[in-house]
Amino acid sequence: MERSMRRCLLLSSLIWLATTALAGDYLLPLEGRQQFTVAISARGMELTGVCIIKTDETGSRGAIVNEFGVHALDFTLSQNRKKVKLLNVIDVMNRWYIKKVVRGDLKYLFQATASPQSKGRRTVMLEDDGSVTLENTKYRLRYSLKPIKNTQDDETAE
């Protein structure tokens, strides 16, 4: 009896270790300052712009700004990526039901790992060009984030 309990504990520990090791392999790594081009499509409308995310020891803070410099929304992301809070949402999107869907989609997007992700109404895909796309089929929303290469860092490295 004791031997089988030990085996069960050892097996469950190995499974837990394997899943936590894979959990750190996120599609969107957030270290320091990250910049992405972003496109959010919803039923014939599209919001395009830039997403800037800064990460420190307390978590991540981000902003989505359109081409004209208007803040669409700001957000915070906890260090373990399990909590997303929307701040300063543009008036068109400042409805509780819209914020609830966007908050859930962003949480799902930032928690996505390198393995194929599809959960119910949400699907995350990694494109060949390095962009990450989330599709919410229930509400017909599509989020696309493509990393912006920092040319200033490339020039200083040479």
Give the residues covered by each predicted segment:
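A general boundary/transition motif marking the beginning of the first structured unit of a protein
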Residues: 1-2, 94
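Short, linear, compositionally biased motifs with a strong N-terminal bias
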Residues: 14-15
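Mature, soluble, non-transmembrane domains
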Residues: 23-25, 37-39, 50, 70, ...
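Bacterial N-terminal signal peptides that target proteins for export
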Residues: 2-11
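Short N-terminal helix-initiation segments at or just after the protein's N-terminus
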Residues: 1, 24-27
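N-terminal, post-signal-peptide region of Sec/Tat-exported proteins
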Residues: 48-80
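A short, Trp-centered hydrophobic/proline-enriched beta-strand micro-motif
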Residues: 26-44
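N-terminal signal peptide c-region/cleavage motif recognized by signal peptidases
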Residues: 18-20
